[in-house]
């Protein structure tokens, strides 16, 4: 992707980076009283919210031993999820240098065979070669960008996947009971949330040559399993 194209999204990407850098470093957020009075805020502070809304990507991924998997926007995924039990080779890309450094310092210690490192960069500009992954995953962050940005992410995921590879991602369900309040909470934390209708994601997937193999609805997000023609 061109440098100019990256610059079009620089403000939102930087805001998202700062929001998660602070969370990973356990730095306090200076929030107004009305934000701290929200029930979702209390769940967020107790870390119960992330567990409740996280998408179970592995249930749709269909991992097989020695699959090569790229986790886009991986955070500290390799430290949280049982990648070793899945016996797949883990590659990552992340905008947060805090998360990237944490994984690269500990990932190889956990499993030097399966952990292949995390690169720093945004989702629309993957730092990997064409056609090398069996699975690509991007959960928890499509909601921070407009649909035209996600088009670029889909095209990049398609580029790095093998012909028979699949892409697993999620999008926020605007009809979820907690969607609007969650978007408000994230606004207080420094980032904008786009409540894009799910049908628009369905249409976009088709426009870029994708086929929806299956979906799964969660507390806040809908999970997609997509192949490309």
Predicted regions and their residues:
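A short glycine-rich, Lys/Arg-flanked "PGG" loop and its adjoining helix->strand segment in the class I
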Residues: 151-163
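Structural signature of beta-strand start/N-cap positions in the alpha/beta core
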Residues: 68, 89, 132-134
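Class I (Rossmann-like) S-adenosyl-L-methionine-dependent methyltransferase catalytic domain
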Residues: 1-65, 75-125, 145-149, 168-229
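A short beta-strand submotif of the Rossmann-like class I SAM-dependent methyltransferase core
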Residues: 138-141
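Conserved beta-strand/loop positions that form the S-adenosyl-L-methionine
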Residues: 72
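A short acidic, Gly/Pro-enriched loop at the edge of an enzyme's catalytic core
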Residues: 124-136
